[in-house]
Structure formats: structure tokens, C-alpha cells
Amino acid sequence: AESFAGTEADTTEENIQARSRGLALMALSNKTGAMVVSTGNKSEMSVGYSTLYGDMCGGYSVLKDVYKTKVFQLCHWRNANRPAHVLGPDGAVVPENIIAKPPTAELKPDQKDEDSLPPYDQLDAILEGLNEKDLSIDDVVAEGHDRALVLRVWRMLLGAEYKRRQAPPGVK
């Protein structure tokens, strides 16, 4: 855009893509009466790895209280199980290539979440200590995490509060 002339591409352009998608989904919602369901999980929402009025749009957030590592576990579990009296097909419903693919916001070529975030196993363990166990930074470090990484996650957690306050409600 002319307004961006002379500036380097950054998350501004990425957010336009996410917001355009959100705009289209909300228009479909208005037209059909269906509800847009937010795709954010607890890991992403905790640290603000989301776009206001983009992937955060929606009327309900099914994965709001589910860390990303648990999302993968749930996908594997559902592919292996179909509880009695539950609607839906037998067998795998989440394609393995989706589960195996490195997580990405898909807002620029070859982008991976780990370009911006710690690996989810580390991020989720730190977030569980800070969020669920109400541990201090020193206590989380004592669990075996790198102090610089814990501090980075802590700063991200604090900085994302304004986004979490605008997120759709969800399962708790």
C-alpha cells in the first residue's frame, strides 16, 4: 500500500491477511446466522500470538483453555477413538499431515510458530507453572527452565493481557 511505501514488511502486512480472513468469516456469519468459532488455544492466547479482529474473531473459543501440546494429544486421541454415542465418523478425522506439520500462523512463506515463540513443549510447561500452579519466576526456573526464557514468556504473558480481555468466551 502507498501508506507503507519506504517501510519494511513486518507483522503489519501479516495482520492485514488475518483480519481479511476474519472479515470474510464474520460476513458469512452475518449472512447465514452461523457462529464463527475462534481457533486460538491457551498457549497462543497467553502470549498474544494472535491478531485482534483476525484469528481472534468469533463468538466462542472451544480451545481457549487448552494448551497447544494438549491440542496435539487430543487430535491423536480422537483419531484413535470414537466414543459411543458421539456423532462423527469412525477413524482418523484430523489428517496426520496436519498434526505432523510444524505449527504456523501461515501469514508469510515458510513461517513457523517457533520463529516467534519457544517450542510449545517448553512454552506450555512454563505457562502451566505461571498460570496453573501460580509459581514465581524463581520456582519455574527451579523446575529446570532457562531463566532468560522464563522471563521472556513472563513478559509476553503480561504484554498480552489487553488481547485476552478482548477474546471470545470459551470452555473453562
What are these regions (language model features)?
Residues 1-172:
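ATP/NTP-dependent adenylation/nucleotidyl-transfer catalytic domains that generate, transfer
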